[in-house]
């Protein structure tokens, strides 16, 4: 397990180097492997542990309910009773999470905050999938989407399903074209939402 964690961190670090076009296929394949959902694992260890493993494998961080410290090292995931560690916040900055992995989040009941920053594989379908998860519709309070170039108006509008969302920050999203339409949509669907935009 420790070896896998170190190798995955090293491989994720290599993605920042300039590569030929052919290497993109390799990284796409490797990221798909990191994102693959293992339903047996979810059943065996519970949704929070399985989602933690997925997120950290892909370079994200998690914070558990009642803790201040962010968990970012795959090799130091806490052990103990399956129901002890519940994910409260996710910071997916520079991670390789993608839509095929989002089934990991289906059983999460306590996630209040998600930060998606510089996530090259996040697209509208990911946001639509997230917003359809009933547990997240109830628990989500804050969301930040920053520098995710594949996100468009369609994906942002889908977030109105997070009926308890209190804060949404959107920045550097070149695919988002109709700011005023988004503002009006959220004013109608989530009138108490604090919406902050830093879009061109």
Swiss-Prot record:
Give the UniProt entry's GO cellular component terms: cytoplasm; mitochondrial inner membrane; proton-transporting ATP synthase complex
* Segments for region (N-terminal domain): 1-61
**Gene3D superfamilies under this entry?**
Ribonuclease Inhibitor
Where located?
Mitochondrion; Mitochondrion inner membrane
Gene Ontology process terms (BP): ATP biosynthetic process; proton transmembrane transport
One term of GO molecular function: metal ion binding
> Which residues are listed for Mg(2+) binding in this entry?
59, 93
Q: What is this protein called?
A: ATP synthase subunit s, mitochondrial
From which organism does this entry originate? Bos taurus
The coding gene here is DMAC2L
């Amino acid at each position: 397990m420790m070896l896998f964690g170190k190798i995955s961190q090293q491989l994720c670090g290599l993605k920042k180097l300039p590569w030929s076009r052919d290497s993109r296929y390799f990284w796409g394949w490797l990221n798909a492997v990191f994102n693959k959902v293992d339903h047996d694992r979810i059943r065996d260890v519970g949704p929070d542990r399985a989602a933690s493993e997925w997120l950290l494998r892909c370079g994200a961080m998690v914070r558990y309910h009642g803790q201040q410290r962010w968990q970012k090292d795959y090799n130091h995931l806490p052990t103990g009773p399956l129901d002890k560690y519940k994910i409260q916040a996710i910071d997916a900055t520079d991670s390789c999470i993608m839509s095929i992995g989002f089934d990991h989040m289906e059983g999460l009941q306590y996630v209040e905050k998600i930060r998606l920053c510089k996530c090259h594989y996040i697209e509208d379908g990911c946001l639509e999938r997230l917003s359809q998860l009933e547990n997240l519709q109830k628990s989500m309070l804050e969301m930040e989407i920053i520098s995710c170039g594949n996100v468009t108006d369609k994906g942002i509008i889908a977030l109105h399903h997070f009926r308890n969302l209190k804060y949404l920050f959107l920045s550097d999203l070149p695919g988002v074209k109709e700011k005023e339409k988004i503002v009006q949509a959220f004013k109608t669907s989530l009138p108490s939402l604090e919406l902050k935009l830093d879009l061109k």
